A protein has these predicted regions:
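N-terminal Rossmann NAD(P)H-binding glycine-rich loop of SDR-like oxidoreductase domains
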Residues: 9-29
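C-terminal substrate-binding subdomain of Rossmann-fold SDR/epimerase-dehydratase oxidoreductases
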Residues: 58, 205-284
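NAD(P)H-binding glycine-rich loop region in Rossmannoid oxidoreductase-like domains
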Residues: 61-99
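Conserved Rossmann-fold NAD(P)-dependent oxidoreductase catalytic core, especially the SDR/UDP-sugar
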Residues: 79, 105-155
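Short alpha-helix in the Rossmann-fold core of NAD(P)-dependent oxidoreductases
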Residues: 82, 92, 97-104, 111, ...
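A conserved pocket-lining segment of Rossmann-fold NAD(P)-dependent short-chain dehydrogenase/reductase
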Residues: 89, 144-152, 178-186, 200-224, ...
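Flexible, glycine-rich beta-alpha linker
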Residues: 127-129, 155, 179-196, 254
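Active-site Tyr-X1-5-Lys
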Residues: 150-179, 206-207
Length: 284
């Protein structure tokens, strides 16, 4: 993190899993000026309570769908904002679209106006769509597979894909310095747990409740721990080539290729040992 010394950094979506961990890691370096952007001030004050009085820490309370309300000059904007909750995909799809598409446009316009600085767009491996069975490894060019338009996650993956297209358009037309980081499934510690499968499984298992899986067959996927994800995104931010895409994944380091049902079994076994409960994994 010392490589960011002397830099002014904005992190959108800073109360989320990746954004909050990224901010806390960068704040370990006192020579970095950090501004976080989030919608919920109470969450900000809770997650970052240890930094509120630090001279190198500021926060903006606003929705990323609106133009960024700041006069600061940022060397880096890490655009982490955007919902990852399946409930939000299903119930508020327009909000998902606006957050991903308007959000990146507002970041790009900010950097374009100030005339310097780099944007790191956090995208997702979901832009690769449903891969062939047992085809886990992909490179950055493998984007020809797409989901059906009635898929519940389509709104997320396609708005991420569109955000990438917009980012590259700004790079081509205005030479805006932007790189794209496509994350595999990120898991790990968060002060505020997101509403995703792994965190919900952990809650249920620790309460001694069974984990009910709605399907019987699950594809294996790459999973990456949050600390590794943060290290890699910082590496990409510092050394990545403008206009390029970088996969952020474990590449099966530590046997991190696993399906969601395999992960559920690991969670249940660990919780049963810790809490002396008898939770189980069941498939409908």
């Amino acid at each position: 993190m010392e490589s960011f010394a002397g830099k002014n950094v904005l992190i959108t979506g800073a109360t989320g899993l990746i954004g909050s961990n990224l901010a806390e890691n960068l704040l370990k370096c006192k020579d970095v000026q950090i501004t976080i952007l989030a919608r919920n001030e109470n969450k900000v004050k809770s997650i970052f309570r240890n930094y509120l009085n630090r001279a190198n820490f500021n926060y903006l309370i606003q929705d990323i769908k609106e133009p960024i309300n700041s006069i600061s000059k940022f060397d880096f904007i890490f655009h982490c904002a955007g919902s990852i909750s399946p409930d939000t995909f299903n119930n508020y799809p327009v909000e998902v679209l606006n957050s991903n598409i308007k959000g990146i446009i507002n970041c790009l316009e900010y950097i374009k106006r100030q005339g310097f600085g780099r944007i790191v767009l956090l995208s997702s491996a979901t832009v690769y769509g449903n891969r062939k069975k047992n085809c886990i490894t992909v490179n950055e060019k493998d984007t020809e597979y797409i989901d059906k338009t009635d898929s519940s996650s389509y709104i997320y993956s396609e708005s991420k894909r569109m955000a990438e297209i917009i980012a590259r358009a700004y790079y081509k037309q205005y030479l805006t310095d932007v790189i794209i980081a496509r994350f595999s499934y990120v898991y790990g510690y968060a002060r505020k747990c997101p509403n995703t499968a792994i965190f919900n499984f952990i809650k249920k298992a620790l309460n001694g409740e069974d984990i009910i899986l709605n399907n019987t067959v699950f594809e294996r996927r790459d999973n990456i721990y949050i600390t590794d994800a943060v290290s890699l995104i910082c590496l990409a931010a510092l050394n990545g080539i403008s206009g390029e895409v970088y996969n952020i994944s474990s590449n099966n380091y530590g046997n991190n290729y696993a399906s969601i049902d395999e992960i559920a079994v690991h969670i249940v076994n660990a919780a049963n040992k810790i809490k002396k409960t008898n939770a189980r994994v069941k498939k409908k």
